[in-house]
């Protein structure tokens, strides 16, 4: 009888221990450069999504809708503006995925830094970046999909000179396009109705964006760019990418 109680106790310990171990593996808080990110998971998938600019509300709404219909992990920045507060300045979170990009991002709104303080800030961002990328990057079979909106005239034509292959559709608005970093993904996406560009070589113009960091890490990356306010269009583009690459 005693042996039965011992075995039962060991079984309970194993069950609760396993649950606690799984909880311990989850990040207590997801932060990067002092700003928080929320995480929404739907099922078990190697597809990761990220929304980086808080002022691009159409992209967020498209994301909210998409993650409820498609499996994956979606990371949402908890901020309402394009830039996020950092130390005594503001930085664009999509310009600090390299040390070079971080340098220019930090100096954009604060040109002068007391001796030693800029290096310290860069070192802190470097440390934060390593931890953040470990969380958001998918495994080797996965893909990282970001969503952005444009409202200042930015369009696919700005990306042509940095792209090795392009598929431009005359019937499509140039401000709506897909950027990818794998040739196989490009070939699949180019068969669809949307503008698509392939950037699979790291450029000297490294601006600190997530696309270049993904390329350096050999991670499949896709950016879905759409005009601010064109929610239906961005929903369709997201669905097309997910259905085409999975």
Over which residues does each language-model region extend?
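Structured catalytic-domain cores with a bias toward divalent-metal coordination
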Residues: 2, 18-246
